């Protein structure tokens, strides 16, 4: 090598040894630094592995706090008592016994949570994930009061009884949990299990007021990826206002027997997604009698009707486009009359259409993002109306 005078300098064995020692020392220091950073990271983010075999202690979920129910029922996981209320078709009878929109609120410091569920898991659809139709969807409240998704799970088989490990390896700190129930499976029992010695107690209801919502498959949550992603559920988590869902896929047609149920629902306000399923002729025949029945049952309470959304499947289907346009036009014309004729009746417009027109699963139902857009579009409209009635 060259020295400072441009002359060739021979590296002696001693210099080579010192260079090697310097290199080795630097490498050793680097290894120590990496190890120290690793230990610091582990200290900042400790691990709490769940034991392989846990003898869980179970509590029936109905002994905790159930929210989102429109009325009391003999089976706490049903939405409507189908012994008391008649007129439903076989499909409707099953739908109103499914706990769509119902959630369990509890507090626990358990490092893992197990579920024992008994129910009817027979319904299947290409457009709805099993995690939504059969699954349980867990959120945990953050320090700032917001809800953060934690974990979900669904039975993999249709056996009536199933045991599932919902979540594990959590820190043993107290957590406020919000567990959404399946949108299209009837439950006869749900037990929540925690580790021995852990606390499991009913949580305080996290949402205020009672706003009932009757609607179609959109309100039911069809094509959501998870049970807690319907637009009414997203609205509750975002605003803190409790929505009580009576979404019935394909069956929200302004029927008199559904009006009978809603007449008995004690709520602060009533929202309807009632123009998505019926055709124009049915809307024309049933809308005003439906409004008059509910106004008589709930005088002074707001009745808020939503126009149906644009279905992406109609873009190139000329027949579907004509049908959809006809019922939207009928809803517009009749609701223009209704809001003038009836006090406390309102009409709002949702929008689930993304800029690229891709927020759909099957051309009819939005995906999670589409339902988020729906929720965002009605939020300011609903809040403005609800505020007039002291619902904030």
What annotation goes with each model-predicted range?
Residues 361-392:
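Histidine-centered active-site loop/cap adjacent to the catalytic His
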Residues 44, 169-171, 177-252, 256-266:
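Serine-esterase "nucleophile elbow" of acetyl-processing enzymes
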């Amino acid at each position: 090598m060259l020295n400072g005078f441009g002359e060739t300098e021979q590296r002696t064995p001693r210099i080579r040894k010192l260079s090697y020692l310097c290199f080795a020392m630097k490498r050793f220091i680097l290894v120590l630094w990496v190890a120290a950073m690793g230990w610091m990271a582990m200290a900042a983010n400790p691990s709490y592995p769940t034991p392989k075999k846990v003898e869980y202690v179970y509590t029936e979920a109905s002994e905790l706090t159930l929210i989102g129910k429109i009325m009391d029922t003999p089976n706490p996981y049903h939405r409507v008592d189908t012994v008391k209320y008649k007129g439903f078709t076989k499909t409707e009878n099953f739908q109103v016994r499914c706990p769509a929109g119902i959630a369990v609120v509890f507090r626990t410091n358990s490092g893992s949570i197990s579920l024992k569920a008994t129910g009817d898991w027979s319904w299947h659809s290409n457009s709805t994930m099993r995690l939504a139709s059969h699954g349980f969807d867990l959120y945990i409240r953050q320090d700032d009061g917001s809800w953060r998704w934690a974990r979900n799970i669904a039975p993999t088989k249709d056996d009536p009884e199933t045991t599932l490990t919902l979540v594990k390896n959590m820190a043993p700190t107290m957590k406020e949990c919000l567990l959404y129930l399946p949108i299209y499976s009837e439950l006869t029992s749900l037990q929540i299990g925690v580790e021995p010695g852990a606390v499991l107690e009913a949580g305080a209801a996290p949402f205020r007021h009672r706003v009932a919502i009757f609607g179609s498959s959109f309100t039911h949550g069809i094509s959501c990826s998870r049970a807690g992603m319907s637009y009414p559920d997203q609205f509750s988590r975002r605003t803190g206002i409790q929505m009580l869902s009576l979404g019935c896929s394909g069956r929200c047609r302004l029927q008199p027997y559904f009006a009978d149920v809603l007449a008995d629902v004690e709520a602060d306000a009533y929202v309807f997604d009632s123009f998505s399923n019926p055709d124009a002729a049915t809307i024309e025949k049933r809308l005003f009698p439906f409004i008059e029945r509910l106004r008589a049952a709930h005088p002074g309470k707001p009745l808020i009707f939503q126009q149906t959304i644009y279905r992406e499947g109609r873009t190139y289907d000329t027949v579907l486009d004509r049908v959809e346009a006809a019922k939207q036009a009928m809803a517009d014309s009749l609701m223009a009359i209704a809001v003038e004729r009836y006090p406390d009746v309102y009409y709002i417009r949702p929008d689930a259409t993304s800029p690229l027109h891709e927020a759909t699963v099957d051309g009819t139902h939005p995906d999670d993002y589409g339902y988020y857009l729906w929720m965002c579009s009605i939020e300011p409209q609903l809040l403005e109306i609800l505020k007039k009635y002291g619902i904030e």
